[in-house]
Amino acid sequence: KCVNSDVNKSDYCPLEAKLGHTLIMVDFTSRWEKPQIDWVKGRIFGDALISSTPPYHRISYLKIDNTPPHSQKYVYSKCRFKTGTKTRFEGDKVNSKCEGSDFINTIYKTWRSQINEVENSFFPKNEDAEQSLIYEYLVHVLREYSADFGSNYQSRELIIVSDLMQYSERVNFFKHCKSAAELLKPKKQQKADKCGSFEKLLKKEKSFANYINATKPNNEMLKNLNVKVLFINHGYQTRKDLYITLQDLWEDMFKYIGISNYEIVPQIDF
């Protein structure tokens, strides 16, 4: 490709093709500690981002917070510009037929500075949220045309950075992740300690089952899709049973709604 004729100058994306889209959703509904921020930054920004994302693939950052999914806007959504150097991606090299190395290097530096600005302002002051709409955000980006994350992209990767403790009016894992012993305590003292199975949740909560069946993505929405979860280990999840059973709960839900290409990467305890 030639930058001058084939690339949109405002977002660095190809004019004629949708090559790929990496959408990074980060859950800010629980408080973050510095080790968690450092771990996540090292995976979704900087050299890790550039070395894992081919040139001219779109990169988008979306925050999960108290904002309803349909009202949330991308923090950033542009394509990864070519480095102008030899990498494992053929498209990173300067096209000597129509490009100069200084020209490409100047644009790359501009693009890189924009990504650095996003990184520096991305992690807000800690605030607990009243709800955690992880599932709702997941369904939103797969279903809605406005998210620009459709199967018309040749490849799609959805990266979810979260502690996975989903709690909303319709999908409440916090309620489902308390043992019988925990439920005997006064309500204000109850904490999540162990999750029941997804199958049990479907049988026990008919409204939950109906909601999942009504909102789960269809086959077209799942084409060319890979999902990666960076599983944040928040302080209250140091209980081993909770950490393991919560991961199992999400794996079973992914399978139920049709997501087969997924990977859950747990944060190492700190």
What are these regions (language model features)?
Residues 16-33, 116-124, 229-235:
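Acidic/histidine-rich, surface-exposed loop or edge segments in extracytoplasmic proteins
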Residues 39-48, 139-143, 208-213:
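N-terminal post-signal-peptidase region of extra-cytosolic proteins
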Residues 1-15, 18-153, 157-160:
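Von Willebrand factor
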Residues 8, 228-270:
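A cross-kingdom marker for long, charged
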Residues 165-242:
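VWA/integrin I-like adhesion module and closely mimicked acidic/polar interface patches used
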Residues 12-23, 153, 222-227:
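A short, charged/proline- and glycine-enriched loop
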